[in-house]
Amino acid sequence: MLDILDCGAGERRPGPYDVTDQNDHFHWFYHRHETEDITENLTGGGHFHLFATPKFFGDILSVHYTHLIAIELDRDGGLGSFFIPNIWVTQEMPRPSGTLKAACQKFDARLNSPNMLISIWLAALTRTFLNDILKLLEQRDRFLAAMPRAERKTYFADTAISRICEWKMD
């Protein structure tokens, strides 16, 4: 997988453009953090960010995508973890987990993809691990619901917190 991506530390693929499907419903990109970024470069393999666009939700007024899941690779290119990043990381329009189920079930950015094999793999992963992804999204919702509303804005902007929740593949 890492050979296909051919992405060095600090780079983003499939540069210079990310992958957005032909219907403008789904979007993904892959990147690796700089080697010195110890908090985000734990596995050395980088990670994918998967999004649903405002168009998928019928939201023509929003310009912000909604982050579905991040998929981390280990240093050998194998599956390392799934995680939900903090809002400052993705600058997204967060939505409750219940509204994201359909997007996770239907995620497919194969049309118009310069990286067809990877797009197929990502679609298969979201279906194979659908229940686990939904559990992470629900965990995020429970965590945030327990947090006083007045503290959320500060939490979302705290650059020391890059991941809200994570499931590591052991």
Predicted regions and their residues:
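Mixed-charge (acidic/basic) macromolecular-recognition segments
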Residues: 78-170
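Short, well-ordered helical secondary-structure segments
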Residues: 4, 58-60, 154
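Aromatic- and glycine-enriched beta-alpha-beta binding-site module
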Residues: 14-82
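N-terminal domain-onset segments
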Residues: 1-20
